[in-house]
Curated annotation (Swiss-Prot):
Function: Catalyzes the intermembrane transfer of phosphatidylglycerol and phosphatidylinositol.
Protein name per its UniProtKB record: Phosphatidylglycerol/phosphatidylinositol transfer protein
Organism annotation: Candida glabrata (strain ATCC 2001 / BCRC 20586 / JCM 3761 / NBRC 0622 / NRRL Y-65 / CBS 138) (Yeast)
Record keywords: Lipid transport, Signal, Transport
Signal peptide: 1-20
Keyword Transport included in the entry's annotation: yes
Amino acid sequence: MQVKSLISSVALWGCAFTVANPIIGWGIGDVDKKAPMPPGFGETKPIPGDSPLKMCDIAEGQLLEITKLDLVPNPPKRGSKLVIKASGEIFETIEEGAYVDVEVRLGYIKLLTQTYDLCEILEDNDVDGLTCPIKKGKYDNLSKDVDIPQEVPPGKYLVTARAYTNDDDLITCITGEVYFPPPGI
């Protein structure tokens, strides 16, 4: 359940949640509805705050503007707690049927291409009380703790998450790299 909780938060508050979750739990989720593009696809811009994550596909209209995203610690460390803090604004109510397409690569190797039901994840997990429908408006200082297992393999992970409404309108696109060094470094 922790994996799904993180993926839902990705859609709303940043790819930070996919940084840990797909790495520790790939293979969990629903059948793909729409395959995500490779990480870094389209134009990107940094998300304000302390994280390695960027908004992607910025030329497309998006229903979520992430105004701040912090990862503590940044970069994340295996065997420790990752605290994700985010603020943003949703411009349209998000209804049942919303989903998140996630792709995780280790270098050029694709580890995960998965679709997650956003509302189901929110119902099953505590993401600061968010449930569908998610009303339009500003959301400040949302926070989620994630335990990153010691067993996360070393390497540079490239993550892309695209969230869509039930009508396939883009909620957000987030991409980024996270490096986990070999143990002892």
